[in-house]
């Protein structure tokens, strides 16, 4: 667990240049056969807006706020949780004019202590794909603690066919995780998995390529 957390902290808060604040990651739009702006709009309309509007939202690993800007613009209150001090500081500056945001620096597995049974929606995209199984399991326990009864979590994660034989060869590569494992972690902590799929817009077949989205309720 510690090595995965340490490696991700080094990569995303020190080594990575964030050339377009996360918008440089366009390959999932390419694989969906649509423009990046269409892909991004589809994700917001299917995975964020139905759950974040007028809600208390917690985002895990916002990075430079690629999705946070949409969440903050429609939610009642947003809590941004990140492992990287520089990423959190960037978000503080970027969203300084918004009064409905607070920030929490995690050590890599925990959510704010005060966020117990008060969160309507937990969202994370492009972060759990890099987390090891033990880190995800720890976060799942925290998500269960943070969500209100009836609350929802949407997690984007890796979908590796055979995690047991998979070898991560560099930091930032997909971790040895699949939907079955994520389902098990969620159910272990009393959460219900409602849907797991690589596609969120069935009509246009827009999704996250070789990864998966898990929708969870409490």
Question: What annotation goes with each model-predicted range?
Answer:
Residues 123:
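A conserved beta-strand element that flanks and buttresses the S-adenosyl-L-methionine
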Residues 126-127:
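Short catalytic micro-motifs in class I SAM-dependent methyltransferases
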Residues 1-54, 60-115, 131-138, 142, ...:
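Class I (Rossmann-like) S-adenosyl-L-methionine-dependent methyltransferase catalytic domain
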């Amino acid at each position: 667990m510690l090595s995965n957390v340490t490696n991700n902290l080094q990569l995303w808060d020190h080594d990575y240049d964030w050339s377009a604040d996360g918008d440089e990651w366009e390959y999932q739009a390419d694989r969906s056969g649509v423009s990046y702006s269409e892909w991004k709009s589809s994700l917001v309309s299917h995975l964020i807006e139905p759950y974040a509007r007028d809600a208390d939202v917690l985002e895990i690993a916002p990075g430079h706020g690629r999705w946070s800007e949409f969440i903050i613009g429609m939610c009642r209150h947003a809590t941004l949780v990140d492992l990287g001090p520089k990423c959190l500081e960037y978000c503080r500056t970027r969203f300084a004019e918004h009064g409905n945001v607070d920030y929490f620096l995690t050590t890599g597995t925990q959510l704010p202590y005060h966020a117990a049974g008060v969160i309507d929606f937990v969202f994370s995209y492009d972060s759990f794909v890099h987390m090891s199984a033990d880190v995800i399991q720890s976060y799942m326990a925290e998500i269960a603690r943070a969500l209100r009864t009836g609350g929802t979590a949407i997690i984007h994660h890796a979908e590796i066919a055979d995690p047991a034989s998979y070898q991560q060869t560099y930091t930032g590569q997909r971790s040895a995780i699949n939907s079955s494992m994520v389902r098990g972690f969620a159910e272990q902590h009393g959460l219900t998995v409602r849907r797991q799929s690589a596609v969120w817009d069935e009509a246009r077949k827009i999704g996250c390529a070789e990864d998966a989205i898990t929708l969870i309720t409490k």
